[in-house]
């Protein structure tokens, strides 16, 4: 058998989950057992290596994706630890775009939680193969098989339990490996470093045999080789099983399921084995696709150092005042000190240093190639979503989609000295975070920051003071609205004026129609653009686009509208781009007024998990907030309530929910749609 290539021995994986499922603890154990960390960091002590921002250590949650590299079984594993809090969904989205595989962590007590579903569907969107780890098997209420059942009900991929627990809750001792037909137990004295495989005890044999049969039946449905041997009653070897599980996992037909307790140091090494055995190397994923920046011809790049360079910038961070750009290299190579080409901006930039990251520590590299995830210093122009490539063989990869902010807050510098720092700090934070928006309100002389939720803005404000020494006074959070129209209208805009010594003319007729909620904006030319000079066409579109952004009535962006450009009148010697831009803008504003402009507010999908005894209080509170209950699902002693609630009614909800349920309920929310309140 030929030796494996370096690429085939790389794994780019993410660790993703709902908040508090224990994924940072899983990451810490992985670093410890692979020798990258000499001391186990605990989240509850604020010592987790991967959670290196002060805000993360105080809150015990992960905010920005930390990247680290470790080695296991002669394979190089690049791990991105991602946040589970919905306010930081963008971090998960960015990570999944550049990963090849994911470890999804579930809480054995809570099961499939709302954010677990969100991240799972995000992974599906990018076709990322997954393995599942059911964590916290030592906790009271842990139920492995219930979580597997929930996965089956909620997700399209079929869960394949390749382990079952040896005991549960305070009786959790280890796992039964259904592939090897052995029990795996861990030595507490060595903090789980030492573990052993042994024969299955007699009282667990029947249970193990029955679950292995289920595993074989599931595999037989997706793999002909296994089906043939299974039906013939032939023995199925360990290598047969590993091959079949790998192929089905890579095809996203199955998700291998494992279990353990990261906090109690049980179950992590088999997860590392599964990462190596079942998740893809860069060679296993399809070639990355893009277009030629000039000709728009479709192109692809295979994962090979022999191909021309193609890479995607997926994250920007400030590190001690210097900009670090995280890059996934899909093909080719890059060297420290060489010039790189930004295909979208058509600019060359020098990569002064290449770094391999370990959370917030680093190792300098001379070069990096296909399959690597590295941090680059020296890229001043490059931002998240930009393509880096070979200038002679350019390719533009698909950029990244970002969510629109739903909440805003006014801030003002405490002193004139803070004001100078504030402007620079916000520019740097916006570079890092594409979901953070900043604008200056001329009327109130306040800076308004907008983001994905209260926690998101809290962290931004905290970082302004802590990292940039820019201290601010904070206003109350405000909801970001949108506008649309109720009725179809036919309107005209006319502009005719002498400015200086030149006459300017423009005449535009538009039809505005309301569209379905969430369907966006559509601009359609009905007038014949072939007879119009290109600068007039551009001016009409600019007039409409600018009015869409600045709003027609209340100053909010206009959404869910179809704009048909029916006529563009010409006047020889007087027609001008200024005239058409103003006429189009005037027609659009007039149309919004006549079409009965209405305000839309963000509606959030809220999921509350509460003890059943507080269900009535929680539902009553949601109704009082003008929420609409979608489903109520009993979950043992708990109950899951899903509802749609206007964001403006949710400020301070976490405090109210805590006091109504004695701190025993948890909730998540994420943007659902803009609609009338």
Curated annotation (Swiss-Prot):
Positions bound to GTP: 17-24, 81-85, 135-138
Source domain of life: Bacteria
Localization per Swiss-Prot or TrEMBL: Cytoplasm
GO annotation, biological process: ribosome disassembly
GO terms for MF: GTP binding; GTPase activity; translation elongation factor activity
CDD domains in the record: EF-G, EFG_III, EFG_like_IV, EFG_mtEFG_C, EFG_mtEFG_II
Main location: cytoplasm
SUPFAM superfamilies in the record: EF-G C-terminal domain-like, P-loop containing nucleoside triphosphate hydrolases, Ribosomal protein S5 domain 2-like, Translation proteins
Keywords, in A-Z order: Cytoplasm, Elongation factor, GTP-binding, Nucleotide-binding, Protein biosynthesis
A GO-annotated cellular component: cytoplasm
Residue stretches making up the tr-type G domain: 8-283
Function comment: Catalyzes the GTP-dependent ribosomal translocation step during translation elongation. During this step, the ribosome changes from the pre-translocational (PRE) to the post-translocational (POST) state as the newly formed A-site-bound peptidyl-tRNA and P-site-bound deacylated tRNA move to the P and E sites, respectively. Catalyzes the coordinated movement of the two tRNA molecules, the mRNA and conformational changes in the ribosome.
Annotated family: Belongs to the TRAFAC class translation factor GTPase superfamily. Classic translation factor GTPase family. EF-G/EF-2 subfamily.
PANTHER family recorded: RIBOSOME-RELEASING FACTOR 2, MITOCHONDRIAL (PTHR43261:SF1), TRANSLATION ELONGATION FACTOR G-RELATED (PTHR43261)
Protein name: Elongation factor G 2
Organism: Syntrophus aciditrophicus (strain SB)
């Amino acid at each position: 058998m030929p030796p494996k290539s370096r690429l085939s021995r790389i794994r780019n994986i993410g660790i993703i989950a709902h908040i508090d499922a224990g994924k940072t603890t899983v990451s810490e154990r992985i670093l410890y057992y692979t020798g990258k960390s000499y001391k186990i960091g605990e989240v509850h002590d604020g010592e987790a290596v991967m959670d290196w921002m002060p805000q993360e250590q105080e809150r015990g949650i992960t905010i920005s994706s930390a990247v680290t590299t470790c080695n296991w079984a002669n394979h190089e594993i690049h791990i991105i630890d991602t946040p589970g809090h919905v306010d930081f969904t963008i971090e998960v989205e960015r990570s999944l775009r550049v990963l090849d595989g994911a470890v999804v962590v579930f809480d054995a007590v809570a099961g499939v939680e709302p954010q677990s579903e969100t991240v799972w569907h995000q992974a599906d969107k990018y076709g990322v193969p997954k393995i599942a780890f059911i964590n916290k098997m030592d906790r009271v209420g842990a139920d492995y098989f219930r979580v597997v059942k929930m996965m089956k009900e909620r997700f399209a991929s079929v869960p394949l339990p390749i382990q079952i627990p040896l005991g549960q809750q305070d009786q959790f001792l280890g796992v039964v490996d259904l592939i090897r037909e052995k029990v795996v137990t861990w030595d507490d004295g060595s903090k789980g470093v030492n573990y052993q495989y042994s024969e299955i005890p007699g009282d667990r044999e029947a249970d193990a045999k029955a679950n292995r049969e289920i595993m074989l039946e599931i595999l037989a449905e997706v793999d002909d080789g296994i089906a043939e041997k299974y039906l013939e009653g032939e023995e199925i070897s360990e290598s047969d099983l590993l091959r079949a599980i790998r192929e089905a996992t890579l095809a996203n037909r199955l998700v291998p399921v494992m279990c353990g307790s990261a906090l109690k140091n049980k179950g992590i090494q088999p997860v590392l084995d599964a990462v190596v055995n079942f998740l893809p190397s860069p060679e296993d994923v399809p070639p990355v696709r893009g277009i030629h920046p000039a000709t728009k011809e479709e192109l692809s790049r295979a994962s090979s150092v022999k191909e021309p360079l193609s890479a995607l910038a997926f994250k920007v961070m400030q590190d001690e005042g210097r900009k670090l750009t995280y890059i996934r290299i899909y093909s080719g190579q890059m060297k420290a000190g060489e010039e790189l080409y930004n295909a979208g901006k058509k600019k060359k930039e020098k990569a002064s240093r290449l770094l391999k990251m370990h959370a917030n520590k680093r190792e300098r590299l001379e070069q990096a190639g296909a399959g690597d995830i590295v941090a680059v210093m020296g890229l001043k122009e490059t931002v998240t979503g930009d393509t880096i490539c070979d200038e002679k063989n350019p390719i533009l990869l698909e950029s990244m989609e970002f969510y629109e902010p739903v909440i805003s807050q006014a801030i003002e510098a405490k002193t004139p000295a803070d004001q100078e720092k504030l402007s620079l700090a916000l520019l740097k934070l916006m570079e890092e975070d594409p979901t953070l928006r900043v604008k200056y309100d001329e009327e109130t002389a306040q800076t308004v920051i907008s983001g994905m939720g209260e926690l998101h803005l809290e962290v931004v404000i905290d970082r302004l003071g802590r990292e940039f020494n820019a201290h601010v006074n904070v206003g109350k959070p405000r909801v970001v609205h949108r506008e649309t129209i109720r009725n179809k209208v036919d309107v005209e805009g006319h502009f005719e004026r002498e400015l200086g010594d030149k006459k300017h003319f423009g005449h535009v007729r538009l039809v505005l129609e309301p569209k379905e909620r969430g369907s966006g904006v559509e601009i359609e030319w009905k007038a014949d653009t072939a007879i119009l000079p290109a600068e007039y066409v551009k001016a009409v579109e600019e007039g409409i686009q600018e009015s869409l952004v600045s709003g027609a009535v209340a100053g909010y962006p206009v959404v869910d509208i179809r704009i048909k450009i029916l006529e563009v009148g010409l006047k020889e010697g007087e027609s001008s781009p200024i005239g058409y831009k103003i006429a189009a803008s005037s027609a659009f504003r007039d149309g919004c007024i006549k079409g009965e402009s209405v305000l839309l507010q963000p509606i959030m999908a809220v999921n509350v998990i509460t003890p059943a005894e507080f269900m009535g209080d929680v539902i009553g509170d949601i109704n009082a907030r003008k929420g609409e209950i979608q489903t109520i699902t009993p979950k043992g002693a708990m109950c899951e309530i899903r509802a749609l609630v206007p964001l403006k009614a949710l400020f301070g909800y976490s405090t109210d929910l805590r006091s109504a349920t004695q701190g025993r309920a948890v909730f998540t929310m994420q943007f659902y749609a803009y609609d009338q309140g």
